[in-house]
Amino acid sequence: AHIDSLFYKGGRVGELMFNTVYLPLSDKEHQVDIHLFRDRNEVAAINAYYKMGQTDYLDGNMNITDLPLEMVNPFIPDNMAKLTGALQGELAISGTASAPDVNGYVRMDSSAVYVTAVGSSFRFDKQDIRIKDNLIRFDKYNIYASGTNPFIIDGTVDIHNPSRMMANLKLTAQNMQLLNVKRNKESMVYGKLLVNLNSTVKGPLDALVMRGDLQLLGGT
């Protein structure tokens, strides 16, 4: 499949091409290879083997080479945010179709998000986010705002049950300059905001419980 140039609400997603090969190995065994291209550059490849039986079995791999995050921007409502950079990673999925095991990693390469409401960009760490035995592991993962002191995420997100993913995270920051924005027409707030944060976030993703301390520092 080939789309010359896909636009959504005036925003360009890109020239997209899907290359798919399906192999029926037997009545109950199937294999599929999928390659995704954006602007004629391969950005992701998926290969999967599926075996039907009393218990269906799945074995697959996904290789994300350089998936441009700007592809998402047209789908963000009201230009609330703008993403830059690329997503990279490798994922392996195996086991029963009803409860597969996921392992691998994802990485944000030179990636940031600009949030229009606060007129600020937040830069993502290039550190790998590991996934082992259906646990997404954040190992002191850093997010930077306008200053040099980061917002730090440490802990796990359990994806064993996709309909009820569970978080167990610690969020910290020390003397973090969260905002440094001059008055402008787009931002809802302006000025400087410096904070200390020491908190936990736990529970299902649709009902998170956050506890901790947030301090506004001098210079705000």
Predicted region positions:
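Interface amphipathic segments
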Residues: 1-90, 98-200, 204-220
